[in-house]
């Protein structure tokens, strides 16, 4: 192994690629944005031939302005780099079209693929098509539709912090009425549990508060559901590790993402601390 590590950051314009690269730069990566795909091999050779410290890390940003043929050939390039002993990973960022259009409206920036009076929706559609080869080979995808800049930086920082010590697990709570996290590897439904929302004295609290915890723990169904989720995840974690996975996202949802899912996510994250190299916790609807 060469000791080099390369992260390719790509995704839809407006989904947070610049934030991702800045976060990696702060974490000690040497970052290059808008690098042509054809030069990735040259960058790898440069890094291998110079007197670089062991474990040096690079990150490159790629977008849809690369020639379509180059984007289609990227998977072959990445395979060649891995065969050379370079630890290579692809991070793909995306968001719903309505969110991207709103972000462009707020920043008044022009989409890189927009030509003349072409509608933004057409440019976004073309970009999704061009970048599909990257999304298909991504090791890690993040839907930033409901993710703040702070949240995105935190997710990437957590990933980088745990990249050298085995499997990292993100446990996330969410509300079904706000949409299922599309980047989750496992999704569990806690709506079968009694809802604290319908208890007037508990409605204003969350699953992080003792009063809600006490209510849920008094329900026999809660312990049964938690035990089944915890057992399933613990059973499959070693399998994911043996398969070479470095990151796993477990999502637990309830109706609004305030009580039941928050409680279960808190407990699951605490339970998984034993046996996992790195466990992080995020409450999407409480962010």
Curated annotation (Swiss-Prot):
UniProt keyword terms in alphabetical order: ATP-binding, GTP-binding, Nucleotide-binding
Annotated binding of GTP, by residue: 63-66
Family, per entry: Belongs to the RapZ-like family.
Annotated PANTHER family: RNASE ADAPTER PROTEIN RAPZ (PTHR30448:SF0)
Binding site for ATP: 11-18
Function: Displays ATPase and GTPase activities.
Protein name listed in UniProt: Nucleotide-binding protein Hhal_2130
Keyword Nucleotidyltransferase carried by entry: no
Single GO term (MF): ATP binding
InterPro entries hit by this protein: P-loop_NTPase, RapZ-like, RapZ-like_N, RapZ_C
Residues in coiled coil: none
């Amino acid at each position: 192994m060469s000791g080099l590590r390369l992260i390719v950051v790509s995704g839809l314009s407006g989904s947070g690629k610049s934030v991702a690269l800045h976060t990696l730069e702060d974490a000690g990566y040497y970052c290059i944005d808008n690098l042509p795909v054809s030069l990735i091999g040259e960058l790898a050779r440069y890094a291998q031939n110079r007197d670089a410290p062991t474990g040096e890390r690079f990150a490159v940003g790629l977008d849809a302005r690369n020639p379509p043929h180059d984007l289609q050939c990227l998977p072959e390039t990445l395979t060649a780099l891995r065969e050379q002993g370079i630890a290579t990973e692809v991070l793909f960022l995306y968001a719903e079209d309505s969110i991207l259009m709103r972000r462009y409206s707020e920043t008044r920036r022009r989409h890189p693929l927009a030509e003349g009076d072409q509608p933004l929706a057409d440019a976004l559609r073309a970009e999704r098509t061009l970048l599909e080869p990257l999304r298909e080979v991504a090791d890690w995808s993040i839907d930033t539709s409901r993710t703040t800049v702070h949240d995105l930086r935190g997710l990437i920082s957590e990933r980088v912090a745990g990249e050298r010590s085995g499997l990292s697990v993100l446990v996330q709570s969410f509300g079904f009425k706000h949409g299922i996290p599309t980047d989750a590897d496992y999704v569990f439904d806690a709506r079968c549990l009694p809802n604290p929302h319908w208890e007037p004295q508990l409605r204003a609290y969350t699953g992080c508060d003792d009063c809600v915890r006490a209510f849920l723990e008094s329900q026999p169904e809660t312990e049964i559901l938690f035990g089944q989720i915890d057992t399933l995840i613990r059973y499959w974690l070693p399998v994911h590790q043996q398969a070479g996975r470095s990151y796993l996202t477990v999502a637990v949802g309830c109706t609004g993402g305030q009580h039941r899912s928050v409680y279960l996510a808190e407990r699951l994250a605490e339970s998984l601390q034993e046996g996992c190299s790195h466990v992080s916790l995020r409450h999407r609807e409480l962010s």
